[in-house]
Amino acid sequence: MIIINKYIRMNKIAILFSFFILICCTGYSISYKINGINENKVLSLSSSPSPSSSSSSSQILEKGKEEIKKIKKTNKNKLLYNVAIVDLEPKLEIEQELLTRNNKKKMEMKEEMDIAMMMMKAADRTDQVSTSSSSSSFSEENKKSSSDDSAPAIQSNLTFSGYMTGGEQVCDPKSCNSPSVFTQNYLCNTSSAWANGYVFHDPVPPTGLFVVHKIVVTFTGMFNVIPPTSMVFSLVNGEENAGIFFISKSSPSQCPNCQISFSPRTLPDVDPNGLASYRYGSNNSIIFNLFETDVACIGKVTANIFYGPVAFKVNSVVPNTAPSTGGETVYFIGEQFYQSSQIQCKFGTVISTGTYINSTCASCVVPPMLQSNSTTPSDYNVTIQLSEDGGSSFCLNTTFFIYTAASIPFVKPTSPNYQKIIYIVVGVGIAVLLIIAVGIYFIIRLRIKNKRLNGSKHALPIGINDDERSPLLKTDYKTLFEIKPIDISEIVVQNRIGRGSCAEVFTGTWRGIIVAIKKAKLLNEDDEDFLNELAQEATIMSQLRHPNICQFLGTCNNPPEILIVMEYMPLGSLYRILHDPSISLDWPRMKSMALDIAKGMNYLHCCDPIVIHRDLKSHNLLVDEHYRVKISDFGLSTRFKKHLDKKTAMTPVGTPCWTAPEVLRNDPYTEKADVFSFAIVLWEIVTREDPYQGMPTFQIVISVGQHKLRPIVPPQVSAPFTRLITECWSEDPQQRPSFQEIVKRLEAM
């Protein structure tokens, strides 16, 4: 809606008023309104008889065109110019069309324009065109009826029906043998294809503002009940694949010789902005083909064509964030913008006229949004609209959000030092924030460093002091090179087989045997913490001797690199094997793998001091060429003396999918946390899937730690194995079996 500003000069109001009187004198009221995509009321045009002759109407029409030219030539006021062009030109184009079609019909006067709205509210008008044909060839009756004096007026949808004739009078005996049962006229195919169609005249003038949105076709006839299904293929002006319809069949008992009317079928490929080859205001054709060898008789075809507005699409708005206090240009990126429309942007209740740039871009200027005393941020919905006649608008696309910063844009500062004060305040604020951020950073680093340095102390059972700690817990990276030192000249590094955030793993040789080499670099202070963990891993592994523990061979100092030499496992991790569909795993092999893991963990839990792995998962279980599984990656492991009546108060570690609920809750825990992780590994072995697949980490932590979520064991898994899994991941750690018991139960299966 365009509202006339009270500040327009009086001579411009006079021109508008004269223009209004001129239109009223024509005795003619023409308007059209687009109401969105509505199947029943999409487009409406109407005309009313006038007592004046067609020649006088034509003269008035010419005068109206001359008046537009004068206003364009003057062009002293942009608002006045927009009102005149948007309001008159579409109406004059449609008026010319209606005068041509109704040159023998008298017209009556109807005055509905309102001067305050400047004739921008259009009246709905409803008409109807219905044409029919009775020839098997393309009929011209539709074209004649649409241009005849007695032709009905235009309606929102165009409907026509055609009766098929010209086919064979007797079809195959199994179908269409009694054509008089269902209709007088029909087309019947036997073993060859047929084509039939109609030419119809489209009554909608090509204004570019509304297009064909939908075509619904209904077929009536008798169809063979024997497969294959017949297929009707519809074309609109040669556009292929406009519609494919599979004919529904009825059984002979239900419909031995009857007329069947399909449910209406909609052509699926009609674009929201119409068919490319469709000719508005001119002749069009629809063809129906039957290509199958099945027998079918078509008696009647009805097509219903629905029109609607051109629907442009907005995909994004730039900028879409704040601050915005008015005056900024906002660009809307989308599709199907067209120049003949008047694009409007509504910022809340404030309207801003849009600017057409091209078919994919338009812009609007943000109006001043805040009141002079406003101190609260305001949110505004930006709605893109298309106004066809300047007064009736309809929403076409998404509502966008623009945040307007709290400010007072209309009050000019009185102090000459206003900007200087602002700069000082902003500068001080930024400096304070930087100081706080740097302080927080160093505090966090200090806490992390202290926690890692004292990690072994926190890993002890409650009540154990420093004197009771094992010497292995006091290891740092400075003693790493004293653990089974290897001379660099004995090592040949070959191919990289793995990479982490702080280290890389290579294959290589040492004294003629193939080994795995973990290579780490000490680049800065932060890496020192990682190397302390690496030293702890090497210290623990150097003391372990078991067939199911990955063998530690030694360390090598090659500044700035540190090398840890380990036993090479050619098949890689258990995780890789379980997720490789080309590797077949039968029950004996799966049981053997589970038993290997249980034996290795039982050895760790029987050590003195006991070793808690804390990160047991399929990624940290390596497999040799004989499918023997060995436990590795002890970077998060810890050792403490046995106090079976105490629980540890250790920092939560591990991977959430495999971590026990008490660890996720940051509760004290024991070596039974490893038993829970083992249960998840058993589930991986029998399912060969990822636990809690698709769930985000935070949801796993909450669901497992608080709501007792567990993976689902497949029903095909044997009862003893299922029972072992469920006991191992019991909520109560005391209910979980020890690895010594697990080994016995697996050996008995």
From Swiss-Prot:
The gene is drkC. Residues 1-31 form the signal peptide. This is Probable serine/threonine-protein kinase drkC. Residues 124-153 are annotated as: Disordered. GO terms for cellular component: cytoplasm; phagocytic vesicle membrane; phagolysosome. It catalyses: L-seryl-[protein] + ATP = O-phospho-L-seryl-[protein] + ADP + H(+); L-threonyl-[protein] + ATP = O-phospho-L-threonyl-[protein] + ADP + H(+). The keyword Signal applies. Keywords: ATP-binding, Glycoprotein, Kinase, Membrane, Nucleotide-binding, Serine/threonine-protein kinase, Signal, Transferase, Transmembrane, Transmembrane helix. PANTHER family: MIXED LINEAGE KINASE DOMAIN-LIKE PROTEIN (PTHR44329:SF298), SERINE/THREONINE-PROTEIN KINASE TNNI3K-RELATED (PTHR44329). The lineage of its organism: Eukaryota, Amoebozoa, Evosea, Eumycetozoa, Dictyostelia. The active site is at 615 (proton acceptor). Residues 491-749 form the Protein kinase domain. Residues 130-139 have a biased composition (Low complexity). It comes from Dictyostelium discoideum (Social amoeba). One of its GO terms (biological process) is signal transduction. One of its GO terms (molecular function) is ATP binding. It is a single-pass type I membrane protein. Its main location: membrane.
